Structures are given as structure tokens and as C-alpha cells.
Amino acid sequence: DLQTTIKQAKNKILDLAIHGKLVPQVPNDEPASELLKRINPKAEITCDNGQYGKIPEGWCETILGELFEHNTGKALNSSNQEGIMRDYLTTSNVYWDTFDLSVVKQMLFKENELEKCTVVKGDLLVCEGGDVGRSAIWNQDYDICIQNHLHRLRPKAELSVRFYYHVLKYLKDNNMIGGKGIGLLGLSSKEL
């Protein structure tokens, strides 16, 4: 079937990109460890191909926390009667590479919660439960808040958020999160 063939082709292209085989590797390019230092000077670089033979020459292994600021949103609390009424997203609004904004809920957010819970254009949102890892990039020209079952990933420097969206999609499609692979039923902050 055509849809299966398209999905397999997308997965193969992403697999090649993740492993540095989609385009030729240029030996004169800046090593990934130097790029990581520019993105996050405090990053701990655990290797630069020392023990990981599976990654391309010049690449390094890191964690999302070195590249993105990470937060989850606010838990719904009916006893909370203070703050500013704001629209917020739940996991039911987030689908693969899109948002369903037909039903957007509201709750009160205190001033000191807004920075942690607000999503801005370019943020990657990732579902913690349900369809674990389901993700989309917020591309609206207005800010919105999130509830606690959504992870907000905001890049610390200029990088391709879309690439990381595709990495999550690849991991999900290949049962490496939320499925048979590592069998996560939820995606906690630590696991992400």
C-alpha cells in the first residue's frame, strides 16, 4: 500500500539522517563537541566518538537537557482561585505535527507560573502520557499555556527543532518509546 511505502521511506531517510549517512560528512566541519559548547557552555561532553562506534565521526552524544530548556505545565487544581485566566493546552490538543484548537480550556495562572507554563512560537511540545511522545511544534503567533502532562522543549540556541520532532516520531514509529521497545507507559522529565 502507498501509505506504508511512504512511511517506510520517511523512516529510512530519518534513520540515515540520524546516523550521519544522508549527506557526506565534511572533515573540515566544526566537531559536534564545539557546536555543543556554543549552544550550552556548561554542557558536559561525555564523549567525542571515544566509545560509541555507532555515531559518525565528529558527532558527540548528549542529552536533550543540554540543548533545550525543559518544563512541564501546571496541574489543574480546582481550589486555585488566584491568578490570570489564560488559555492552556492539554494532551488532547496535541497531535503529530499539528494542534487541534477546537476546544481550548482555561484556568488561572499566577504571575510566577507564567514563565514556566507559557509556550511561544518555535517550542516543541511532547505528550507525557496517552500516545506517549506525540509531538508538535507551536508555530502560532500568540503565546499559550500548558498543563502538566505536556513537556515544553525550548531551544537554548538556534537549532532545528523540526529535526528533534522527527527524532521523536522515528523513536515512536520504531517502538523505542511508549511501545514494545523500552516499554514506557509514560514519558517523565527524566526519561525525556
Task: Give the positions of each predicted feature.
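Proline-centric
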Residues: 1-3, 16-17, 24, 53-62, ...
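Non-catalytic DNA-recognition/assembly elements of restriction-modification systems
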Residues: 1-4, 11-12, 21-22, 45-74
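Generic recognition of stable, solvent-exposed alpha-helical segments in well-folded globular domains
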Residues: 4-12, 34, 54, 59-63, ...
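Short coil/turn segments at secondary-structure boundaries
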Residues: 24-30, 47-50, 77-85, 103, ...
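A short beta-sheet element
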Residues: 90-91, 109-172, 181-183, 188
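Sequence-specific dsDNA recognition surfaces
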Residues: 47-50, 65-78, 92-121, 141, ...
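Amphipathic alpha-helical coiled-coil/heptad-repeat segments
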Residues: 1-39
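Short helix/loop capping segments that flank catalytic or ligand/cofactor-binding pockets
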Residues: 25-26, 97-99, 135-136, 161-162
